[in-house]
Swiss-Prot record:
It is found in: Cytoplasm. This is 2-dehydro-3-deoxyphosphooctonate aldolase. Its main location: cytoplasm. The gene is kdsA. Belongs to the KdsA family. One of its GO terms (molecular function) is 3-deoxy-8-phosphooctulonate synthase activity. GO terms for biological process: keto-3-deoxy-D-manno-octulosonic acid biosynthetic process. NCBIfam families: KDO8P_synth (TIGR01362), PRK05198.1 (NF003543). Keywords: Cytoplasm, Lipopolysaccharide biosynthesis, Transferase. It catalyses: D-arabinose 5-phosphate + phosphoenolpyruvate + H2O = 3-deoxy-alpha-D-manno-2-octulosonate-8-phosphate + phosphate. GO terms for cellular component: cytoplasm. Pathway: Carbohydrate biosynthesis; 3-deoxy-D-manno-octulosonate biosynthesis; 3-deoxy-D-manno-octulosonate from D-ribulose 5-phosphate: step 2/3; Bacterial outer membrane biogenesis; lipopolysaccharide biosynthesis. Its EC number is 2.5.1.55. InterPro entries: Aldolase_TIM, DAHP1/KDSA, KDO8P_synthase.
Length: 274
C-alpha cells in the first residue's frame, strides 16, 4: 500500500492523480503573487487538478552576489499568508536555516528543503519539529537510493509525512540530466515522489554570473515523468519568464501552462489505470 500524504482535501500519492505544485520562482511583491495565484487557482479549478502554491521569499544560493534574492522572510511570509487566505490554497516554500522553520510553519503547509541542503541534519530536525509536511529536493549530487538516509533522519525526528522531489543529477559541468529510474527508486521507499520539471532543465552557472536553462525541454521531461507515475508535478511559472528575477530560462510561460497540463492529465490517467 503506497503512502498517501493528506493536506486539507488534497491526497498526495504515487498511485493517485498528480498534484500540481506551481508558482513563480521567487516572491516579487504582493500584487504579483496575488495575480499569479488567481490565474493558477482558476486554471487548476477548471482542469480539476489539485493545486499547491509555491514561491520563495529568499533565493539563498544565487550564483552571483549580485543576483536578486527576494523580498525576505518577514515580507515574504506576509505575502504568502495573503495568498493563502484570499484563495484558500495550500502553500509550500523553502527554508534555508533552522531559524526560519518556526516562523515559516505558521504560514506554509509544507516546508521545502532545498536540494543543496538535503543532508543538513540540523535543518531537517528543525523542520521536523514544526509538525508540518516536509518536502525534500534530492541533491543534484545524490543517488536516488541515498534518499533513504534522508528518510531515516526525518522519521527519527518524528516526521510522519514526507515528500521527495527529483530535480535532475549533475552531468559534467553546468548541466543536469533526469534519470527517470529515480522516480521509481524513491517511490520504493514508500514516499510520495514529485518531479521538478523546470529545475531539471537548469544549466547551473551556465550563464557565467547566473544559471541558464533549456525551457524547451520542460514539457518533454514532464511527459516522461508522468508516464513513469508520480505523486506531484512541480513547475515554476511566470507571465514573463525572460524578465523574471531568477530562473527565467527554466520557468514555463503562464500562457502555455494549460495546454501542457491537459496533456499531462492524459498521460497520468493512462499510467495509473488499474
Amino acid at each position: 500500500m503506497q503512502k498517501v500524504v493528506k493536506l486539507n482535501n488534497i491526497k498526495i500519492g504515487n498511485d493517485l492523480p498528480f498534484v500540481l505544485i506551481t508558482g513563480p520562482c521567487q516572491i516579487e511583491g504582493k500584487d504579483h503573487a496575488l495575480f499569479m495565484a488567481e490565474k493558477l487557482v482558476k486554471l487548476t479549478s477548471k482542469l480539476e487538478i489539485p493545486f499547491i502554491y509555491k514561491s520563495s521569499f529568499d533565493k539563498a544560493n544565487r550564483t552571483s552576489v549580485h543576483g536578486i534574492r527576494g523580498v525576505g522572510i518577514e515580507k515574504g511570509l506576509e505575502i504568502l499568508s495573503k495568498v493563502k487566505s484570499e484563495f484558500d490554497c495550500p502553500i509550500v516554500t523553502d527554508v534555508h536555516s533552522e531559524s526560519q522553520c518556526t516562523a515559516t510553519a505558521e504560514v506554509a503547509d509544507i516546508l521545502q528543503i532545498p536540494a543543496f541542503l538535503c543532508r543538513q541534519t540540523d535543518l531537517l530536525q528543525a523542520a521536523a519539529k514544526t509538525g508540518k509536511i516536509v518536502k525534500v529536493k534530492k541533491g543534484q549530487f545524490l543517488a536516488p537510493w541515498d534518499m533513504k538516509n534522508v528518510q531515516t533522519k526525518l522519521e527519527t525526528f518524528g516526521v510522519k509525512d514526507i515528500l521527495f522531489t527529483e530535480r535532475g543529477a549533475c552531468f559534467g559541468y553546468n548541466n543536469l540530466v533526469s534519470d527517470m529510474r529515480s522516480l521509481a527508486i524513491m517511490a520504493e521507499l514508500n514516499v510520495p515522489v514529485v518531479f521538478d520539471a523546470t529545475h531539471s532543465v537548469q544549466q547551473p552557472g551556465g550563464l557565467g554570473g547566473s544559471t541558464g536553462g533549456e525551457r524547451k525541454y520542460v514539457e518533454l521531461l514532464a511527459k516522461a515523468a508522468t508516464s513513469v507515475g508520480i505523486a506531484g508535478m512541480y513547475m515554476e511559472v511566470h507571465q514573463d519568464p525572460d524578465n523574471a528575477p531568477s530562473d527565467g530560462p527554466c520557468m514555463m510561460k503562464l500562457d502555455n501552462l494549460e495546454s501542457i497540463l491537459i496533456k499531462l492529465k492524459k498521460y497520468d490517467k493512462i499510467t495509473k489505470e488499474k
